[in-house]
A protein has these predicted regions:
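A catalytic-pocket lid/entrance helix-loop region that shapes and gates access to the active site
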Residues: 2-53, 99-115, 119-125
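Alpha/beta-hydrolase fold active-site neighborhood
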Residues: 51-187
Length: 188
């Protein structure tokens, strides 16, 4: 038996999600340092400057999504997901993430970053999802750690978390609203 991500059973979704946001912020710092050291970073400057440039790039996608080779644009949320999902395995994922970011930053083309997202969510080129792992993740998370916060409560948390985890804190806080209303009682 393999236990992955064992958490205290008393941990709330808010506690777990905040912990993830802080941990991913540490991963962003690691990626930024690696990006500078690689000599193949699409952003210039120190690791701290690369972190800020990455955040600015992602935030800019909200107002100016990047075109891709498909009919889909690379939006801020898709850009964040691409970066987030490629922070797990530095030796194998960082080079691919750097290359995709380079294409986006230097060529204004979001195709490679969108491809990274599709890979992680098992979306085929024709738009079909090859499994329901994303839905299963939410179902299990929401059943294990229900969350019934309000939009106002999450807005307050998003603002606070943004201070501690400026790359993903706000998005992680808002993501908890996905669990409002879970678990849903079965109809008899």
């Amino acid at each position: 038996m393999v236990l992955d991500g064992v958490l205290p059973v008393t941990a709330s979704q808010e506690e777990v999600t905040f912990g993830q946001a802080v941990s991913f912020e540490a991963s962003v710092k690691h990626f930024a340092a690696d990006c500078v050291d690689s000599g193949e970073c699409p952003f210039v400057g120190s690791a701290r400057e690369v972190e800020q440039a990455l955040r600015s790039f992602l935030a800019g996608l909200d107002d100016s999504p990047l075109p891709t080779a498909s009919d889909r644009e690379l939006t801020e949320s898709l850009g964040q997901y691409a970066v987030l999902s490629f922070l797990y395995f530095p030796s194998s994922d960082y080079p691919r993430l750097r290359a995709a970011l380079t294409e986006a930053v230097e060529e204004d083309d979001g195709t490679a970053l969108l491809s990274l997202v599709d890979e992680r969510v098992n979306r085929s080129p024709d738009g079909r999802y090859l499994d329901n792992s994303t839905e299963a993740f939410y179902a299990v998370t929401c059943a294990d750690m229900p969350y019934n916060g309000t939009v106002d409560e999450v807005a307050r948390l998003a603002s606070q978390w943004q201070e501690v985890a400026p790359t993903f804190g706000e998005a992680f806080a808002w993501g908890m609203l996905s669990c409002v209303g879970w678990p849903q009682a079965a109809e008899s």
